[in-house]
Amino acid sequence: MKALRGASPLALAGMLATAANVGVTLLIARMLTTRGYGALAQLIALFFVLSMPGSALLVGVVRRVTAWRRVSRLDLVADWVRATRRRALVLVILFSLLAIALRGVIAEWMNLPSPAGVAETLSAGAVWGLLSLDRGLLQAGHAYPPLGRNLIVEGLSRCLLTVALVAVGLGVQGATLAILLSVIFADLDARRSLTALDLYDPTRIPADPGPAAGDPAAGDPVVAPAPPAAGEPTPDAGAMRAVVAHSEAVHSNDAHSRRSLTVDVGTALAALALLGVLQNIDVVLLGRAEPSNAGAYAAISVATKLLVLAALVLSSFLLPEAAARRHLGEHALHQLGATLTILAIPAALLLTVSFFAPRQLLGVAFGGRLTAAAPAFATLAAAMSCLAMTVLFTHYLLAVGRRRIVFLLLAGAAVATVLIASRHGAPVATARADLITQAGLAAVTGASVLHVTRKSVRVS
């Protein structure tokens, strides 16, 4: 119950932001042409693929800052954040310029009607990295109320801007520009929260308790011998050697921290990028193979993939909780169970409606012209329910430092690509291929979580 109470406010904020986005999605479905809506769905899928690597930094931030807090090294956080922000800004600018130059080529490869919105989508994916950095700092500090507010800021600003820009005639480009601006506004809000809370000032906020003994991720703090007081004898050669050894240990620990952060971010980069592929490969491949089906399939895709977005919101609670408990030699199965329980509510509702009244729901939400993929609705809802569980399992495994999850996700993405591509753009066949892959992957990743937990219990 305690875990449920901790996750519920964040889940509520995420649900509010998601509900607002759903409302706008339904509205612009009626404002855009069928082909235009299909193109927007492809660009949104591209954004989520690009945002997953950016979110990898969030995982690395949470794990590394949690480890630094355990060994009373909050002094390292501010310098690292400043340096990382500088490098990230340079990369965002360069990537955005490259996106402008290549927007025509990318639009042609994706079989889009025009390059409109491509550069904005790519730039939004790059800026997401900055937002992920700041959200990671909020998560590592367990600042869940400001984090929940930040989700609402992003969601509501995206909604308002999308309606306004599409209404003035900017169409797909206006919708993608709204995504870019909402990410920028959310990052500004996160920066403001971090400044106000001052979470990582070592002179004001005490560090967390140290990790369990023998924790290789955080390292054990080394205490230097105190200098002699006035009148006391000068330390002998043995004491001087101890001082030198301490200095070398500190430098070694700092180097270990940098290497560990690089590995954490690299692992999360691969894992979350693969989750992005698994989430959107069906939309991209179907739209490329059969553009005439893209709009109708996008309608069911938008509805079902809200479950994945809900899982990502819940991961904002699960990730820091699992990382913190891992450093204490404990598991976070109660927190994982709480997030799965919350996720089960919208999943059950969507599965019920998509099975018994798919065409009616799509007709009310999107209009009669986007109901052609209704027979695939329930199947895709089941597939995305499985993927949502995989998202939670993956974040749990990343939080406890299990890097083999990348190979499982890579295998799943490869299987999904082959199976979906072989369906040649048929909505029902595409959804079935997706379900086969996602169900198998959820089972394997869930088993991995249980294996890791049993192993940690035996060790402890």
Which functions belong to the PLM regions below?
Residues 1-20, 190-194, 206-215, 219-268, ...:
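N-terminal membrane topogenesis motif
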Residues 2-59, 96, 266-289:
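Signature of the first transmembrane helix
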Residues 44-55, 268, 275, 287, ...:
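Transmembrane helix-bundle signature of multi-pass secondary active exporters and lipid flippases
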Residues 82-110, 164, 337-366, 375, ...:
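Alpha-helical transmembrane segments of multi-pass membrane transport and lipid-handling proteins
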Residues 115-122, 148-200, 428-453:
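Hydrophobic alpha-helical transmembrane segments
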Residues 128-149, 382-408:
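Membrane-interface junctions at transmembrane-helix termini in multi-pass inner-membrane proteins
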